[in-house]
From Swiss-Prot:
Upper classification of the organism: Eukaryota, Metazoa, Chordata, Craniata, Vertebrata
Name of the protein: Venom nerve growth factor 1
Cell compartments where the protein resides: Secreted
GO molecular function, one term: lipid binding
Alphabetical list of SUPFAM superfamilies matching this protein: Cystine-knot cytokines (SSF57501)
PANTHER family: BETA-NERVE GROWTH FACTOR, NERVE GROWTH FACTOR NGF -RELATED
Length: 243
């Protein structure tokens, strides 16, 4: 009887020793571990590839503002829209090339008649008085052509989207704005140049005006008055004397 028990115990131990080891108990560096690592790496790489392909097929949704600006750049404008243009300002220019710099003392206009279809630009020389040396401006200002204005305030104080590029008869025109502003955006303690600070308070500030510009209204282009910087002026007030 005892011999039978010993035989069963030995057979049981031999069966346990011959049984395949589980993957959890496989030592590091064994073939089973290498196969498992390769399989997991392949699955991870495949998952990243699938995720990347999914992102390409389904790109992240753009913001409403970006979509509006994109549509403003790609919209095709009817040439008849320029025939309805009124209140033309020399500070607004549609051109296929950068306008002359302000130091050239030229004012550039956009031709609203048939010549616009030929992308012609007319520049006329203005007569400027000759300044003597030693003359200074009360406020220092800078004037530049702004080429990438996308946002502005209309005459009602509401924000509007300004068209940067205009597609007219398969030609892309850029909308430029000639703006003038104070060189120093913050008022200086000394005030305006040449103003007697003993009797007057003064500071330089940028003033604005409204010009007709091509803007986006929904999904179509329309003319609207927008506000741009046009001058740097001196604001003065009399100092109150204490008696």
């Amino acid at each position: 009887m005892s011999m039978l028990c010993y035989t069963l115990i030995i057979a049981f131990l031999i069966g346990i020793w011959a049984a395949p080891k589980s993957e959890d108990n496989v030592p590091l560096g064994s073939p089973a571990t290498s196969d498992l690592s390769d399989t997991s790496c392949a699955q991870t790489h495949e998952g990243l590839k699938t995720s990347r392909n999914t992102d390409q097929r389904h790109p992240a949704p753009k913001k409403a503002e970006d979509q509006e600006l994109g549509s403003a750049a790609n919209i095709i404008v009817d040439p008849k829209l320029f025939q309805k243009r009124r209140f033309q300002s020399p500070r607004v220019l549609f051109s296929t090339q950068p306008p002359p710099l302000s130091r050239d003392e030229q004012s550039v206009e956009f031709l609203d008649n048939e010549d616009t279809l030929n992308r012609n630009i007319r520049a006329k020389r203005e007569t400027h008085p000759v300044h003597n040396r030693g003359e200074y401006s009360v406020c220092d200002s800078i004037s530049v052509w702004v080429a990438n204005k996308t946002k502005a305030m209309d005459i009602k104080g509401k924000p509007v989207t300004v068209m940067v590029d205009v597609n007219l008869n398969n030609h892309v025109y850029k909308q430029y704005f000639f703006e003038t502003k104070c060189r120093n955006p913050n008022p200086v303690p000394s005030g305006c140049r040449g103003i007697d600070s003993r009797h007057w308070n003064s500071y330089c500030t940028t003033t604005h005006t409204f010009v007709k510009a091509l803007t986006m209204e929904g999904n179509r282009a329309s003319w609207r008055f927008i506000r741009i910087d046009t001058a740097c002026v001196c604001v003065i007030s009399r100092k109150t004397e204490n008696f």
